[in-house]
Structure formats: C-alpha cells, structure tokens
Amino acid sequence: MAATPAPAVGKVLELLGKAAAAAAAAMGIKETVKDRPGTRAREADCSEVSDDADCDQCLLINGRIGPPPTPRYIAKSNRINYDYQLYVANLHAGPERFGYVRAGDNSNSIVNIELSMLKDFFGTGGKYTTLEWMFGGVAFDGFWRSRCTVVEAKGRFGHFFDENGDGKKRFMDDIPVQWVQSFTKQRSVVQVTDPDGRLEWHFMDVNAYQAGKNAGIPEEVARLTPFAIGRIL
C-alpha cells in the first residue's frame, strides 16, 4: 500500500482532532443541560427514530412531570376545565401520562376521581390537582415528547365572549390579557429550545379561540380543539 504523503497525514489528524472536539462538546451539552434555558436544540423528531437517545436533542424533555406550584382547586363547578386540560395534555403524550392526583401526594400517582366524586367534589374542592409539565421554572398543561411540544389548554371560556371574541362584559376583556401574560412567560422559556421546541395553546370554544387570537396569541400557536365531554385520553 502506498504511503500517505506527510501533508495529507497532517490534514487527516487535523480533521480527526476537530471531530473529537465537536463530539466532546456535544457530550458536554448533553450531560449539563437539565432544565436550563440558553442552549439551542438540534433537530430530532422522536416519532421517526428508534433509539430513545436520539430524542435527547429535544431540550423540552429536560423538564419534569408533577403537580403545579400553584394549587388547583378542582370542584364540580369547574371540573370540565381540568378534564379538558388533561384531554389535550394526553392527545399525543407518551410515555408521560397526565391525570388527577391527590393534593400533597408527591408520588404522582394518578387516581380515578370518579370513585370519589360524590363525596369529595361538593363545596370548594381542593382535594385534587393535576399533573403538569414543568420546564425552565414554568408550568405547562402537558408535554408531547414525540412532537417536542408543550401545550396549554383553555376549557369552558366561550360564554364570556361573543362570536367576535369580544368580552360580553367589560371585566371579561381582562381574561385574554391574562392569557397573553401567561403565553409570553411560556414562550420566553420555549424559545431557547429552538428550532425543535414548540408551544401550542388549545381552546375548547370558538369564541374563546377568537378572543385569544385577538389579544395576541399567534395564529401558529392557537388551536381550536373541540372536546367530547367525558373523554380524558
């Protein structure tokens, strides 16, 4: 076999050195990124790969599932909003599963609240909360690992707005303002996971969907997702 000229050997060694440095840097990012904003993700769609390790390119997986830091007082009067939240959260979730848990239970054990609804859902509630996805210190209603997407859900709000998305009473116009504040906070932590990380807001009612868009929820983020009552995936 012919000997490789010295300049070619030097070039090969230089390329190998650069490749090793790049691999080490990539490994360093993989080991140190844990719920930290500021590092850009690389493209990876977990629905198209066979090796779970390849899904590590989605930085949103560095969040965690658990009860939200702010208590959720779930009662009979507002339960549909949380049923819808869990419906949206589980539409494309996996292996994560979002459900109801007992307030204060740190084991994240999902419970069937139908069994306790009659005795526990009278009054102001407060005995149950929901599992959500925490990333960058911000809570999201759900996480779709296969799509590298975090989601927010807005349930029965349509009766507050007319068909144009305007509040039926003046104070009702404050609701979309609060939505935009929440969206802005969520977007700030999702942006650092570009280009893979995505945020979607799902609305059960068309009037609320219109109100959200009027207030500033971007068209590419807002989704009208009707709910078949009683369906929690």
Which residues does each PLM region occupy?
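Flexible, charged surface loops at secondary-structure boundaries
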Residues: T124-G125, F143-R145, V192-P195
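A solvent-exposed, charged loop/short amphipathic helix patch at secondary-structure junctions
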Residues: R156-V177
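Acidic-basic catalytic patches of nuclease active cores, encompassing PD-(D/E)XK
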Residues: A3-V138
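Active-site or metal-binding loop neighborhoods of secreted/extracellular toxin and effector enzymes
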Residues: M1-A22, V180, T184-L233
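Conserved catalytic cores of phosphodiester-cleaving nucleases, focusing on short active-site segments
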Residues: F140-W144, C148-E163, Q186
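Short secondary-structure boundary/capping elements
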Residues: M134, Q178-Q181
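Conserved aromatic-histidine-acidic binding/catalytic patches
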Residues: T130, D174, Q178, E200
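Alpha-helix initiation/capping motif
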Residues: T70-P71, N78, W144, G165-K168
